[in-house]
Amino acid sequence: MSFDGFTDATEAQVTRAISDSWMEEFRERTDTEVIVVGGGPSGLVAAKELAERGVDVTIVEKNNYLGGGFWLGGFLMNKVTVRDPAQRVLDELGVPYEESDEAEGLYVADGPHACSALIKAACDAGAKIQNMTEFTDVVLREDDRVGGIVMNWTPVHALPRELTCVDPIAVESDLVLDATGHDAVVLSKLSERGVLDVNGIEHAKEHNTGMDKTADGEYGAPGHDSPGHDSMWVSESEDSIVDATGVVHPGVVASGMAVATAHHLPRMGPTFGAMLLSGRQAAQSCLDELGRDAPDVSISGPAPADD
């Protein structure tokens, strides 16, 4: 088998191809229907469901990678669990899984397979991604309705103040989905601005020094404990999070662990069914808020067809 070589392209042509394509897409995304802040499992599911129904949706993710904690289960083990009926999302994604001997309706899948399949599904549906981009503030309108977000490149945050002063930019949207996990950064900013009382954050202020932080006052990595939500209780947590997913402030919907912080609900640890189904519930909430004439999102999904 012979190889005839690649086609010719200069370095400048490669650079222009990248920058022109990125800028064209970015300009289109400065005013969109839904901005999903956080590209973890709940945010990806919500973006996928919305994009499949023709909603213009952009995911803003502060890391270089998507997926949040969905790549791994607990304790650096790369197996993830879901409980019935969330395995139907894995069926839809084509991700294999096995039922555990530990409990009926408890399923185990490979984290990298499940996470990469979900990322692909969101991209294939038409969701656009702005990664390495950090949420820094909200755009407010009349009556404190949120009308978009303020954002900056993630590396800017890591630079010492003496070395840089880089203003952020703002993008507008009809809705913002806080899918940022334990820290609930969109809700935290609204609380900081004094326009929203967030149960979990108020509890943290009363009983702790504040939201979970590491050195130098920075937020901890995804998966760290947070006084914004309650302690671990798998069965109570997952049901409660899906039930409480929805609008939390005019222009803002919350999903996933951000819901636990919003309502001071228990955490569920390394099981992901609530993240997946909360994403679906959040997508339906967004459709309702937008008034879109689109097929409803089935929260638990149709039962798999019989063989």
Curated annotation (Swiss-Prot):
Residue positions, PTM 2,3-didehydroalanine (Cys): 165
Disruption outcome: Cells lacking this gene are auxotrophic for thiamine. The mutants thiamine requirement can be overcome by adding thiazole moiety 4-methyl-5-(beta-hydroxyethyl)thiazole (THZ) to the growth medium.
Catalysed reaction equations from the record: [ADP-thiazole synthase]-L-cysteine + glycine + NAD(+) = [ADP-thiazole synthase]-dehydroalanine + ADP-5-ethyl-4-methylthiazole-2-carboxylate + nicotinamide + 3 H2O + 2 H(+)
Metal-binding recorded as keyword: yes
Modification(s) after translation: During the catalytic reaction, a sulfide is transferred from Cys-165 to a reaction intermediate, generating a dehydroalanine residue.
Assembly and binders: Homooctamer; tetramer of dimers.
NCBIfam families: sulfide-dependent adenosine diphosphate thiazole synthase
Function: Involved in biosynthesis of the thiamine precursor thiazole. Catalyzes the conversion of NAD and glycine to adenosine diphosphate 5-(2-hydroxyethyl)-4-methylthiazole-2-carboxylic acid (ADT), an adenylated thiazole intermediate. The reaction includes an iron-dependent sulfide transfer from a conserved cysteine residue of the protein to a thiazole intermediate. The enzyme can only undergo a single turnover, which suggests it is a suicide enzyme.
Protein name: Thiamine thiazole synthase
Organism: Haloferax volcanii (strain ATCC 29605 / DSM 3757 / JCM 8879 / NBRC 14742 / NCIMB 2012 / VKM B-1768 / DS2)
Taxonomic lineage of the native organism: Archaea, Methanobacteriati, Methanobacteriota, Stenosarchaea group, Halobacteria
Gene: thi4
